[in-house]
Amino acid sequence: MIQPQTHLNVADNSGARELMCIRIIGASNRRYAHIGDVIVAVIKEAVPNMPLERSEVIRAVIVRTCKELKRDNGMIIRYDDNAAVVIDQEGNPKGTRVFGAIARELRKLNFTKIVSLAPEVL
């Protein structure tokens, strides 16, 4: 579960290393975001000499959470970290690579470009 002020790792090579969630896109008073939700975040740590800089406000989609994800077949998936992929306004990733495993639920939510870049889909 991701809420405002939560720090997340970045799972792509867009230039950001760490994000802080400042808003959850969707209903006006959503408290938590889960895998596949789009958030507004600020970059807290960035790689030098890259297009994205520190304190820049961006959009990102959540690809991993520490909170368990329960599927319809009874399977429970839990990751070791909270991670997101930086996206543009159309929902396309800004980076060209995605690191780490991501959940299969992103394919149902039309983030197929992110799924195709991922090395492992659980």
UniProtKB/Swiss-Prot annotation:
Any one biological process term the GO annotation gives: translation
Domain of life: Eukaryota
Role: Binds to 23S rRNA.
Family matches, as SUPFAM superfamilies: Ribosomal protein L14
Assembly and interaction partners: Part of the 50S ribosomal subunit.
GO molecular-function terms, A-Z: large ribosomal subunit rRNA binding; structural constituent of ribosome
Name of the gene this protein is made from: rpl14
UniProt KW Chloroplast keyword: yes
The protein's name: Large ribosomal subunit protein uL14c
Protein location: Plastid, Chloroplast
